[in-house]
Regions:
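Terminal helix/beta-alpha structural elements that buttress the NAD(P)+-binding lobe
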Residues: 1-182
Length: 182
């Protein structure tokens, strides 16, 4: 939902997918079109809404299958898919650029990531410092809002929350644990 808001504020027409129970919620965050990700016509639905002008996709589900679907949705000229996990790029259309934005990169230091060693990136550190100021302002001004939350209780409820999440029961919300009650 954060990405939907940033894209909308940046002037993009946001087309997204979700389960039908979250259509209205995602529209309230700025999505112009929302389609059922389980629909057998989801690729055609998104393509039709984009009117052949789809260039950028953010895949927050981040599985090989979801990234493949994203790539198939892009028109023949290609485009850019940002995904949260590495995928086997050898199976993807060469006209598509795949980006994996890693939060760790904002430290500006090298770090191991699975079998890869990610290089230091002073540029990412400088970018993140600039954007932290901008994002803070957007939040304070009410232009960015957080996801709906589900309060699970105290730290004793963490195991329950992890099970809840592993069973696929977390949809369009963040699980929150009360560490200190005032």
């Amino acid at each position: 939902m954060f990405v939907i808001q940033l894209a909308t504020l940046s002037g993009f027409k946001v087309i997204t997918t979700s389960s039908p129970s979250n259509f209205d919620l995602l529209k309230s965050y700025g999505a112009k079109y929302v389609f059922d990700y389980k629909s057998p016509t989801v690729i055609e639905d998104v393509s039709r809404a984009a009117n052949g002008r789809l260039k950028y996709i953010f895949d927050c589900h981040a599985t090989d299958n979801s990234t493949q679907t994203a790539v198939k949705t892009l028109p023949g000229a290609g485009g850019v898919v940002a995904t949260l996990l590495y995928v086997d790029e050898s199976t993807l259309d060469r006209k598509v650029e795949v980006h994996v934005p890693l939060l760790y990169k904002i430290s500006g230091k090298a770090f191991p990531f699975g079998p890869r060693q990610m290089p230091a990136s002073p540029e990412d550190k400088a970018w993140s410092e600039e954007w932290c100021v901008k994002l803070s302002k957007l939040v304070v001004e009410g232009n960015i809002r957080g996801n709906p939350i589900k309060v699970m209780g105290g730290l004793e409820a963490v195991a329950e929350g992890l099970k809840f999440m592993q069973e696929g029961n977390v949809h369009a919300q963040k699980l929150v644990y009360e560490v200190l009650k005032e």
